[in-house]
């Protein structure tokens, strides 16, 4: 993760959260909308790292929760946070 020299502008991060797979859009756009403003620089770097990965890997990590041991620690922590956030959001009662 040290290869990330600068963080992307917020608008670019949000654009990159649009993945093309509905399942990934739900995870990334939902997490971005709910959490990005509160994220630390390290967490934003981890998100940027994840956004550079291929969709099949991201799907495996997020949807099927197959997070590899050799992934950088900040990325693993963020993936777990994204999974927990999505579960919490799914379980929240809808307001009509």
Tell what function each PLM region has.
Residues 2-45, 49-96:
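Positively charged, polar, low-complexity stretches
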């Amino acid at each position: 993760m040290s290869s990330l020299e600068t963080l992307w502008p917020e608008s670019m991060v949000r654009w990159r959260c649009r993945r093309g797979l509905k399942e990934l859009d739900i995870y990334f756009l939902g997490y971005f909308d709910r959490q990005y403003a509160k994220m630390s620089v390290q967490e934003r770097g981890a998100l940027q790292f994840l956004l550079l990965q291929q969709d099949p890997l991201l799907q495996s990590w997020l949807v099927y929760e197959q997070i590899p041991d050799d992934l950088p620690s900040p990325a693993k922590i963020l993936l777990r946070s994204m999974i927990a956030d999505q579960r919490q959001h799914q379980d929240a009662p809808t307001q009509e």
